[in-house]
Design a protein with these regions (language model features):
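Short cysteine-rich clusters marking metal-coordination/redox-active sites
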Residues: 11-14, 25-28
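Short glycine-rich substrate-engagement loop in P-loop NTPases that contacts/grips substrate
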Residues: 79, 140-167
Length: 279
């Protein structure tokens, strides 16, 4: 019997997997993009581990006429500029990627969104893999985040995060950032092609399985695209880019992909001492 492979080659651009190194990716046609990474081996879940999303459920087809659309499936963020770019607010169970240069204000924007949503009665869980709780608290105080329904967690293990989401049952989850997250059954480093792909896949299952909206923060490369495999943008429902010059106060938010709205809208913000304000 053939021995199972311990490593494989992944295209950094599109995530294509190959048993051997290739000069050109047969899918995205880019050159010299393959990196060797460990292959995830199937593991039996240990006793007490959180079950996979949707495990044990029976798949039953539903007629389209039986599917109801409720206006409450969209939630205003408290920012009219953001709501317009999203297409009239947040869609329940959606997975939204927010990309931008480090330090441009992605975390500040989402922390203010958390404040608005929690103030409106939503249960919000902000998960940081880059800052300590004290650092988040300092930033939260600066922008006036004092509401009670806003939970914070410093964690990078997505299997642990899965359990925390299942127990706390939030309406909205923020993952800051996807490049710091990892799956236990993937032996490559956080931020690698396989880690980013599998981490996003689990977050997608959580969003759809629990009906929770998840925002993923992603840093961009010098080429201006989200770091990690391009397949990441194909997996999520919405891709937003937060752009601007760190030496200038103005920021622009635009959608390059949106399954629930237009990609022709932009939102304009101004960075002030106490956070972002709409223009």
């Amino acid at each position: 019997m053939a021995k199972a492979r311990n490593t494989a080659f992944f295209c950094k651009e599109c995530g294509y997997e190959s048993a051997k190194w290739l000069g050109q990716c047969p899918v995205c046609k880019e050159w010299n993009t393959f990196v060797e990474e460990p292959v995830a081996q199937a593991k039996k879940a240990p006793s007490g581990q959180i079950a996979a999303v949707g495990a044990g459920k029976t798949a039953v087809p539903v007629h389209i006429s039986e599917i109801s659309l409720d206006e409450q499936d969209r939630t205003p963020t408290g920012f009219g500029e953001l709501d317009r770019v999203l297409g009239s607010g947040i869609v329940k169970g959606s997975l939204v990627l927010v990309g931008g240069d480090p330090g441009i204000g992605k975390s500040t924007l989402l922390l203010q969104v958390c404040r608005n949503l929690a103030g409106a009665g939503k249960r919000v869980l902000y998960i940081s893999g880059e800052e300590s709780l004290k650092q988040i608290k300092m930033r939260a105080n600066r922008i006036g985040v004092i509401t009670g329904e806003l939970l914070f967690l410093c964690e990078t293990n997505l299997d642990t995060i899965h359990g925390a989401i299942e127990r706390s049952k939030p309406d909205i989850v923020i993952i800051d950032s996807i490049q710091t997250m990892f799956r236990e059954d993937i032996s490559s480093a956080p931020g690698s092609v396989s880690q980013v792909r599998e981490s996003t896949n689990l977050l997608m299952q959580i969003a759809k399985g629990y009906g929770v909206t998840i925002f993923i923060v992603g840093h961009v490369t010098k080429e201006g695209v989200v770091a990690g495999p391009r397949v990441l943008e194909h997996m999520v429902d919405t891709v937003l880019y937060f752009e601007g010059d760190r030496n200038d106060a103005y920021r622009v938010l635009r959608a390059v992909k949106n399954r629930f709205g237009s990609t022709n809208e932009i939102g304009v913000f101004e960075m002030e001492e106490k956070g972002l304000s709409e223009v």
